[in-house]
Amino acid sequence: MRIWCLVWCLVIAVVSQSVVAQAGDAWLQFQGDALRSGNAAAAEVPSRLGLVGAVPLSDGIYTSPAVADGKVYAVDGSGVVWAIDAATLNVQWKFATRGGAGNCNNVSSPAIVGKYLHLGTMAGFYYVLDRHTGALVREIDCREAIFSSPAAGADRVYFATVGAQVYAVEPDGTVAWTWDFVKEVIGFDGDRWSGEAWLQARPDRVTWRDHFVCSRELCLIGKTLVIPAGGRTVFLDDAGSSAKLRVAGEIPAYDGKEFPATFGQSADSAGNVYVQWHRRDNAGRVEILKLNGDAVATDFVKGTQTAIHLPGLLSFASVSIRGDDVYRVRPEQGLGLCRHSAGQEQPQVLCPAPSICPPVIAREHVLYGGLDGKLYVVPLAEGEAQSLATAFEAPITAPVAVADGRIYVPSEDGYLYVFGEHGKAPLPTRDLNVKQARSPLAGRFSAAKFDWYTNYGNFGCTNANEQELRPPLRMRWVRRLEGTVKHLPVCGGGRLYTHTAEGQIIACEQDTGRLLWRRHFPDVYLSFTSPLYVNGKLLVPQAGIKQSRMRCLDAETGKLLWEAPFTGSPSWSRQFPPVVHGNIAIYASGSGTYAPQGTEKPFTFKGTPQESADGKEVMSWIYSNDNPYYPRDNRPLLWAWDLNTGKIVWEKDFSEYGRGGNDCGICIMDGKLYYSTFFGYSASHRARRGLPPENNGLTACIEPETGKVVWQSTKHYVTAKCTLTGRDGRLYIGGYNQANELSKDRFVWCLNAKDGSLIWQSDPITSALNAVSVGDRFIFSNALRGRGNVFDRETGKVVGGVDHNYACCRFTMSEPYILGANMDMIDLSAGSKLVSTGPAIDSRECLGAVVSNGRIFYTSQASGFIVSQTYGEDALNLPAVWNR
């Protein structure tokens, strides 16, 4: 017994040394310590940095390396572990973790614990390896993906699964205890990944109260583990043989009270926990939480607060802390790296380059990777920042490691770059082609005709398809997202495309979710717009207050082919990308002057209007849903570009009929372009302001080749927050506002596409948002905090509805079902019965799921998460990689 105790004490001593040895000779875990502070005060950066070499791995790298005893340990996206000699950069050994093609997008960074190397994988296995030989010491089957990196303490290591199951393990991987957030805090004991199980346990749909995902990093403060789970900050003590819950801390109410998403979490040695959170629509800040007994005291870092009406974008990374200073990155040009100092209301900009990569604070510099693929070395004192390029401009999204005067930089191009003093190595020239798909989409619906290739499914904007959707639903894959989104998933070429409101364009495999490529363009500002996949190209309207560009990319590689300017604000509801006819891409927008906050109440969404310096009308970039009129300089515009070159083919300006243009819709049907726009419901206000009073809106049929108007009507038109839908020779028009100031009623209108004449007007409804979904059997529209409606195809009578009180959810239809927030599935053929709900991965309910190519895809609007599900027979045959 005495010998065992001596041995165990020796192990503890070794482990303790390994954890605190954060001098310049080692980098033992993510962000340098279990606090995730990023504070490496002992690490020196050479004055003359250059590339020492670049080590090719087997996939993109989304993890941070660990360094000790002259070896570098890295994990690539495919879960391959690499041990590299720091002096020669030769590979000493490598270890392929289990899971095959589905074991991708690995983000759990390795940790060195004495003679062991710890890491988790997307396949749901946790590994302990002998770090000297690569031999497997222990494999723990957690049966859930692991996003968090191991947090190594004095005598134990901690990690959590994405489903918020927490593990404490000994250095050799022996499990000391487990703790389950879903069971202990939410009180749910079923299959957390099953929508049917949640429905059995709940009388209604899941909401933000059921949110449970743990997708970001843990912190360890002494013996207290801090876990970002389900929008809460959980303080959990290691009580020896078990865990003891101290408190599940909550972010204070600000722009709502829902449990928000955590996009980054770190702590300092004083016990302060810094949480970068997001609740909705750019609203968030860095909250400071600290245990006070079994309660939590809160404050926030001044100058980090963002909102829909305030200037500045969210951050999507943890902050780094030294003393009273907080260092924070953002994906915003001009505000890339900022220092927030105690007592200062506004931050100091240290480097303008945008980033989603947590910074590392060395002795005299801050180090971070940019979305432009460069390493930035920024002096803490005066002086110019140094930028060091990588070979292929691929983003650097995982933090660097610093040891022995070298900087180890993981890149999404698949290379581990090593920078050091007097480095003179050339950049690599061999493209590792991580952008090539490795798991092609297969199955009965894999053909291109089954693609959901644009925001509303097709150029008719029917928002509907039929691909034999039926229960049961089963998870296929999950992946993390560092951004916010308001468009529906878009698919084509076996790839899923995402455009974040902050300017990232991302492509991943539909089958596995594996990241293929990521591009970021500066000056994109809250652009809630969707990509379009067409003919191997990707068209993305990227809007911003400073500039707006239509960008055409090669869909396979992300290479920019052309870009063209446009004007106006997409605001909340103009998610749609261009429509394409032949070789012409056509887009609709407005014009005008914009700022985060407008000059009049009808031009703002919230807050006090702000007068402009020159007295001119200014529209909020994200403006009110209630639209009696629009500013004088808002013109309704149409743009037509050559799809191959981006050259203008024709333009159209309808401002002689009214002012507006941002709240509009377009679709293609039977070789014709249909356009509808809103000028505001109040003719009397427009007359008093000297604006054209005659028309509240306009709908037109146009020749797409030339822009020639075939017919136009000012009798029926969209009333904002809705596009128009074309199918079977009919147009369907909805919206949020009343059509005129004499009535509060809203309707869906069905028009004859030949001449614009009215076929039917629906029963009065609360509103009709986003798009009127028109399938073979059903016509449906959602309402904002009201009843969603099912309409009779021939009369417009309301014949059914959905009463689950959704907000602005962008439902889609895959008959006979509609798909809503958190993958809710409602059967319209069974009286709008809810047949599946959840899992609750999103704290908001702005987006629905889509069915494309026989799979379900869902992007959380607020919580930084993308998932795919299978259904029917495929649910039995194509499980998630962790589902065994």
Protein language model features and the residues they cover:
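A short beta-strand motif characteristic of beta-propeller blades
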Residues: 51-55, 90-99, 135-140, 175-179, ...
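Blade/loop signatures of beta-propeller domains
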Residues: 23-51, 190, 441-475
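Bacterial N-terminal signal peptides
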Residues: 5-17
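Sec/Tat signal peptide C-region and signal peptidase I cleavage site
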Residues: 19-21
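Repeat-blade elements of multi-bladed beta-propeller folds
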Residues: 24-34, 58-82, 95-127, 139-167, ...
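Non-catalytic propeptide/linker segments at domain boundaries
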Residues: 427-442, 446-448
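Short loop/turn segments that connect beta-strands within beta-propeller blades
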Residues: 85-89, 130-134, 170-174, 237-241, ...
